[in-house]
Every structure is written in structure tokens, then in C-alpha cells.
Amino acid sequence: KPTKPNSHHFFNIKNKSIFTHIKLNIYPDGGVARIRIYGNMKINKQFGKKVINLTSVLNGASPIACNNEHFGRAENILAPGVGKNMGDGWETRRSRGKNFDWLILKCATAGKINKIQIDTHHFKGNYPDKCSLQAAYLNGKISAKSIVNKSKNWKLLLSKVKLHAHKKHNFKNKLMKNKKVNYIKINI
């Protein structure tokens, strides 16, 4: 479709097919600053019984909602590998009241949690003192607002634990060992 210089262009696509690759052709030539393709991931059933990172963006996990993204985007914690710096993680401005900061993630696929890793790499003076995790298995299409409201009553996946600066914290799932989950709430 024809476009104009120095502007954003949005195109609605009605194709329901599943794609793994997109090719952008520009005619006759020129430059494109950014391309963003929005859509929903189709979960690959090849995982089967294989142990995978249920909260990896590469496997299809996504952030649903959070209460604060003052210094870093919540979606950053889903990225693969080790963070480059603090800006490459999720950082809040810290709640000073009795409430805590939280983030809700939709898992790549429903699964049973074996182990949990909370990484505070690069966070030396501003790591969360404690954290807890809640989880649930929710069926059907549910709005983000409804998920946030329901999350207040989710079961504990990890009881409140002390965290430390610049460290990978590893935990075994003892509270919901044989329960299937597809949403996780991080409380810090």
C-alpha cells in the first residue's frame, strides 16, 4: 500500500493464517525506521512433556497487567538471557504503603511448575526485599481487568521469601506441585 514520509502507517489485516516469517518490500526504495507486527501467538504443541520456561517471550509468554513500570517495562523480565543492565529489567518506583507492586504474566502454555528462578542481576541497591508468587489456571478469553480482580484470590505458588542483590534465586515448587497453571502473579 502507498505510504507517506515521516509518518506512522497502520494497516488492518484480515488474514487468519499463522505466519512464522514476514517479508517487507519497499518500492522503489527508501528507508523504514521500525516495523511492528501485532498479533496473537499460536502455542506450539511440540512442547509435549518437555520442560520449558513457561515465562519466556520466546515460548509465547506475555505480560497481562502490572501496577507500576516507573523505571523499567514489565515485559523485560520475559526476555531471554541475562539482562544487560537495570534498564533491561522490570523496576518500579516502590510502593511505600502497605500494598506491594505486582505483575501478572500469561504463561506460554498451561503447565505444572517444577522450579522457579527470580533473578535480581544488576539490581544492587534497588532489588525487592521480598517477593511472593501466586498462580491460577483460567479457562477461556478473559479481560485483563477481570484477571487482575481474580488474582487477589489466587493460590500461593511461592510464599514470601527474602531476596538479595545481584543474584539468581532458585526455588522448588512445594505449594502447587501438581497443579496446572497458565497465569502467574509476581508480588514484590
Show which residues each predicted segment covers.
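Trp- and acidic/polar-enriched beta-sheet ligand-binding modules for extracellular glycan
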Residues: 1-102, 112, 122-188
